[in-house]
A protein has these predicted regions:
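A short alpha-helical cap/connector motif
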Residues: 1-121, 128-146, 152-201
Length: 201
């Protein structure tokens, strides 16, 4: 795979043109941001192993994460990506329209995704914050399926009162979820990490 697949490059260009934040720092605490390159490459590695499977993405955004996934997944794999913001969903649909394996849906991902499983890979890139919703997502995985959540601050970067950090809710859920074997992957910038878990039961 190229360092940056052409589909990802086009998604980046569209994001810049639309003013969509490319980093969490640009976005601030209450806005979504684009899929970082380190996260995208990680997703590509997982997607490449989903032959004959189904991948779900909660929060299409500018389509960068979907671009990484679609560029790597096998020909017999399907990607369902859901975005609640109509202009973003429309732009991503235009970007991905040539790939019949990809379906871009406008709507609330937590309402749409449960009806489309089971999944071999789920990328929860939207503002999922409720542990009950996290548990639902795990239930949508096949045994052996994987879930990835990004926009997490590494533990060494958390403030003293870490209980107030929204991303620590994700880490706490993964820690206490008995159906997952999981780990945290710190990205090269040392300011961002992602959580990845495999459903075992």
């Amino acid at each position: 795979m190229d360092q940056f697949p052409s589909l990802v490059m086009r998604a980046h260009a569209a994001a810049r043109q639309a003013g969509f934040p490319l980093t969490r720092e640009e976005a601030g605490p209450d806005r979504p941001s684009a899929c970082l390159p380190g996260v995208g490459r990680f997703l590509a590695v997982l997607a490449a192993g989903c032959g004959g499977g189904r991948i779900g993405e909660l929060g299409t955004g500018a389509g960068i994460g979907a671009g990484w996934i679609a560029s790597a997944m096998p020909a017999d794999c399907a990607l369902i990506t859901v975005e609640i913001d109509e202009p973003l969903a429309r732009a991503a649909r235009e970007l991905l329209t040539a790939d019949s394996r990809v379906e871009v849906i406008t709507g609330d991902a937590l309402r749409v995704i449960p009806g489309r499983g089971p999944f071999d890979l789920l990328f929860a890139d939207s503002g999922v914050r409720d542990p009950a919703d996290f548990a639902v997502l795990v239930s949508l995985l096949r045994i052996g399926g994987r879930i990835v959540m990004d926009d997490v601050t590494p533990e060494h970067g958390l403030p003293p009162d870490a209980s107030l950090r929204a991303d620590d809710i994700k880490r706490s859920f993964f820690t206490g979820e008995p159906r997952l074997t999981w780990t945290e992957v710190v990205l090269p910038d040392l300011r961002n990490s992602l959580l990845v878990g495999t459903r075992t039961t």
